From Swiss-Prot:
Biological process according to GO: anterior/posterior axis specification; ganglion mother cell fate determination; generation of neurons; negative regulation of transcription by RNA polymerase II; neuroblast fate determination; positive regulation of transcription by RNA polymerase II; posterior head segmentation; regulation of development, heterochronic
UniProt-recorded name of the protein: Protein hunchback
Lineage, top ranks: Eukaryota, Metazoa, Ecdysozoa, Arthropoda, Hexapoda
Tissue/organ expression: In embryo, expression of maternal transcript is highest in anterior region. Zygotic transcript is expressed in anterior region until the beginning of gastrulation and in posterior region until early gastrulation. After this, it is expressed in developing nervous system.
Subcellular location: Nucleus
A Pfam match: zf-C2H2
Repeat recorded as keyword: yes
Chain intervals with Low complexity compositional bias: 398-415, 513-522, 652-695
Amino acid sequence: MQNWETTATTNYEQHNAWYNSMFAANIKQEPGHHLDGNSVASSPRQSPIPSTNHLEQFLKQQQQQLQQQPMDTLCAMTPSPSQNDQNSLQHYDANLQQQLLQQQQYQQHFQAAQQQHHHHHHLMGGFNPLTPPGLPNPMQHFYGGNLRPSPQPTPTSASTIAPVAVATGSSEKLQALTPPMDVTPPKSPAKSSQSNIEPEKEHDQMSNSSEDMKYMAESEDDDTNIRMPIYNSHGKMKNYKCKTCGVVAITKVDFWAHTRTHMKPDKILQCPKCPFVTEFKHHLEYHIRKHKNQKPFQCDKCSYTCVNKSMLNSHRKSHSSVYQYRCADCDYATKYCHSFKLHLRKYGHKPGMVLDEDGTPNPSLVIDVYGTRRGPKSKNGGPIASGGSGSGSRKSNVAAVAPQQQQSQPAQPVATSQLSAALQGFPLVQGNSAPPAASPVLPLPASPAKSVASVEQTPSLPSPANLLPPLASLLQQNRNMAFFPYWNLNLQMLAAQQQAAVLAQLSPRMREQLQQQNQQQSDNEEEEQDDEYERKSVDSAMDLSQGTPVKEDEQQQQPQQPLAMNLKVEEEATPLMSSSNASRRKGRVLKLDTLLQLRSEAMTSPEQLKVPSTPMPTASSPIAGRKPMPEEHCSGTSSADESMETAHVPQANTSASSTASSSGNSSNASSNSNGNSSSNSSSNGTTSAVAAPPSGTPAAAGAIYECKYCDIFFKDAVLYTIHMGYHSCDDVFKCNMCGEKCDGPVGLFVHMARNAHS
């Protein structure tokens, strides 16, 4: 009968010997680690087991666990072992105890790793399945070495300390070999990254080429910033250009050494801590603040601080959405004047209207493109700057006169828009809304050179003439300006454009009301002037040797025009027109106050005497305040009357075209001064086809000139002539200046207001 106990023991020993021989041939052995002698002596028939390390023991235990289940089944099928086989049972007990101890150790390592990750709420270095549990995080040296594993329970046996030490040593070797899975490592170590952050910020600050960023903060004790070239974040090297000679340096030390050569020795101010030199005390003060890291200027909208006010102003623009500087020739817009000047110099463009910080247009600011001054220039009635050419500069020059008389101006109910915004600051030319008898005689200037600051102005209802700025004041403030070559005029052209723009925006109803109001005023004044004329003709002293009496109000109102003529008060009673009829009445108007006023006006402006003044060739201007005389009255004029008439007709003509003669139309004067007296007298008694003044219009209302194409009335011959000059001969709505064809009168007005013609 077969012995089942002997057969089972023999099979187990053979399998164990084969398993050990396999590991002995394939796994490298480590000397010094032997099994316990008791376990070896307890199995005399067992083959000698080679010493293994910690990893080999772990593999053995796993293999033995797999074999444990079939062995248990086999033992259940066989009878219980006899007394002779107690040694083999002790061998099984030793292996099971060793497996339990190793499992407890791995469970402790795994629990410690879980507690560490749970304490930081995230896997700092990412979870790597290739790393055994319990090993340190391979990325923890990037986040600091202060992390320590939680305390672990001390193993009970001394045999478990060696595996833990072996695992710790192997983890240090695996830190550099195990790559992270979910976290991207930094580009450089912590120390090098911190040292590179500060120079990068300084490079970005110094890369700004603006003058306002001249004194940027830098390290006080770091000489590399001033002795080495500086590169910005884009890799571009910072250059320092000399404003005097144009030499370009790449380091601050070289630039300061070169700048010293352009300074006077007695004006050099040098920094005590570095080679910085300057001629200005405030520059040295800002530089010393930089060394001391003092930044007294702070932004009220953020935490930005700086060493001077200029840098703070530049920084505040970063919080604003207003681009103050815009190019007139392209879509370029910027917040910084220095960049705007560079654009204008590079492309040869012209500047547009400068905006204030709140976004409102400011025509009084001019961009000096080639000047060294920072920011725009403010004009106070002076000549136009060299860089301020264009329509924007002319508007700003006209607007410079406005602040002198803004306080005395009443509010006018005139429709405003962008086209008429430039007229809001102008004082209005006043028209007499009351009859001449009720209106006092004002000491008005007799020439454009006379200052208009002393003229008292009374509020009146709006009229087309009230929409114009005072041309006499503008001419007096800007006598040295360049003239327009076409009409030999300067600001009259701009005034006509502005008037056309404003009148074009008035509604037809308002325009009709203004015309009816002016017509009613002129009719009332005409009736009163006729009654006064008849009364004075009867009551005044008669002298048959003199000509027709001159109206009193005519002499009172003629000086109200900005005249530049030769006033001869000795011949104030000489008639303007004479006739040979026996029934004519000749008398002298005995108004001493008016004569004294005329004499004083003539004495105050002697430089304007003897200026040739003739009517404009486009439209013959009528004598203000006179009825046209019949032609038969002029047929038999005596030679004496002809001589007196020739001497005084230019004076009457000046009342309607005085501004034209004062603005320099000498060519027209020379061409018309050779005419005889009969032609002058006939031209004074008639009007052209376009001029339609009412019959007997008094001097208070003045002559009215009408453009039949645009249905606009003018009270000044120069403005009327300028306006008619824009109408072309072949097409009345085609601009005669530039040839652009416009769509009706409104289109022509808008074209004149928006485009500069020179």
